[in-house]
């Protein structure tokens, strides 16, 4: 059920957030990941009853890895400085940094939105890697059973932490299968838009 605590509104627009992202990220892989997580977060906002906060959720997803390309060793630690300089509010900075909880920072995901980001971030990478192995190169025809096999194969997309994904599902109170199913649907919702943008993207 939806939490009763009112979520904050973003202090920057989506366009401003994207310009901020591009200021520190040029690699097409990182841009694609940011856009994918943005789309996933927007889908989850609507799915979980936070449609009025879709923009906020999306911007959190868009900016969640803002410091990773230039400062990989300081991930989620350098982010507050970059975000604050870009006009991002403290609440959003907290939410963004919370996806590194227990990995690189001690900022705990508390709100449902933060738990969704924590759970889905690594998983989108695993799903994307699995999609590239398919003839279609797409999530549109991906089934949960196929993803489960890839999840169990620790050598596949080894950089995507299974432990983080499991912990994320537990924090949400979901079974892994539900997280897989929902995140596949979320990625289907934005795949076309992300592909269209990346087809014309130039760093």
Feature-to-residue mapping (PLM):
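Divalent metal-dependent catalytic cores for phosphoryl transfer on phosphate-bearing substrates
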Residues: 50-156, 166
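Acidic/His-rich, divalent-metal-binding segments that scaffold phosphate/diphosphate chemistry
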Residues: 7-71
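Charged/polar positions within long, soluble alpha-helices
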Residues: 46, 128-131, 192, 196-199
């Amino acid at each position: 059920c939806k939490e009763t605590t009112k979520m904050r509104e973003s202090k920057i627009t989506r366009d401003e957030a994207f310009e901020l992202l591009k200021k520190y990220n040029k690699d097409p892989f990182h841009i694609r990941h940011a856009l994918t997580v943005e789309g996933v977060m927007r889908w989850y906002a609507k799915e979980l009853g936070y449609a009025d906060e879709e923009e906020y959720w999306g911007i959190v997803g868009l900016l969640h890895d803002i410091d990773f390309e230039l400062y990989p060793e300081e991930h989620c630690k350098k982010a507050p400085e970059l975000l604050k300089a870009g006009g991002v509010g403290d609440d959003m900075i907290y939410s963004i940094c919370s996806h590194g909880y227990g990995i690189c920072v001690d900022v705990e995901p508390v709100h449902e939105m933060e738990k969704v980001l924590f759970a889905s971030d690594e998983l989108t990478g695993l799903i994307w890697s699995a999609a590239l192995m398919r003839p279609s190169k797409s999530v549109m025809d991906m089934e949960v059973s196929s993803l489960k096999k890839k999840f169990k194969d620790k050598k596949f997309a080894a950089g995507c932490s299974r432990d983080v994904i499991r912990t994320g599902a537990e924090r949400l109170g979901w079974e892994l299968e539900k997280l897989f199913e929902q995140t596949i649907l979320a990625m289907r919702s934005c795949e076309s838009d992300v592909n269209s943008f990346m087809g014309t993207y130039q760093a």
